[in-house]
Amino acid sequence: MSKKHRVKHPKRKQLGSLKYQISQLRVEPSDQKSKKPMSVSTVKQYKKHAQEFGAWCKEHYKCKTVDACKKHIQDYSDYLRASGKSASTIHTYLAGVCRVLDVPLDTINKPIRVVADNTRSRGTKAVDERKDAGREVSPRLYDFACIAGIRRAEYLHLTPEDLVEDDFVNPCILVRKGKGGKRQLQRILPEELPAIKAVYGNPADANHLFSKDEMNNKIDLHHLRALRAQQMYRYYLNRIQTENGYREQLISEIRHTWEKDDKARKENGYKAKRWSDMKVTGNYILRGNNRKLAKKHGLPLQYDRLALLAVSIFHLSHWRHDVTVANYLLAV
């Protein structure tokens, strides 16, 4: 056939590698009405899980496109379960996969998460026996963490300027960008201030409180965070029960902080949280598996709602009773 009569076929569009295709997908917030885009860290985490899923699809099903991968999300869920992953871990992985690939998470069959079955920072694990998991590997960080009770990533970004006071003149550690990009003030007790000042007086450098070497370890900082939450619950409960007027003072501080946070949320395009006096009234009663776990370990079966919310707001930045109890006070 001569060149003159040769039929030309259009070139097939090159999609790129599966990893590249996933990296180019736009990730939408779960609430489509929200004007605020998802945080960079959340999108990065979701795409990481989606790319891991893509690599699994390529290995097991020779998938080359995102659409081909979508058919195997249920297979991936079954694979994770057979691999011994916990219900919480499976949900975390699938949440990223489904959000990035735009597949409703509720269409995927997966194990039900039970908070009482969580294993993070609970019991003894092999990592706890490692030489780089004890206090001696980084005593300055360890002792500071026992008081601060923040997340590992947040220690990395502390600066020598982050020792401040809140609106009630309580000494606080300023976390400029916590989980989800939230700014938070981590309360410390006045009697703990000298120990904290000693660390701030000897920073790693002009921009970091702790060096990379100090952070390079396997210390279970989440466990120390849970211990701090338990300590502060006892602290607030004792003052509520023994000091005249302290309950009213604490409620006033919480309401002020709540309203200030709501104002910031509105300015950033988020809905305000709904306040109810029930949040600081009566006791939070454990039920179901959490109640069984508490009984097994001889822990309280109910918690003072006011003391609980104080811990959740001033020390964990979760703003919720249930998360505080299940993930911190029951972390044994």
Language-model regions, residue ranges each:
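Conserved tyrosine-mediated DNA breakage-rejoining catalytic core shared by Y-recombinases
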Residues: 157-195
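Non-catalytic DNA-binding core/recognition domains of DNA-processing enzymes
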Residues: 34-105, 303, 313-316
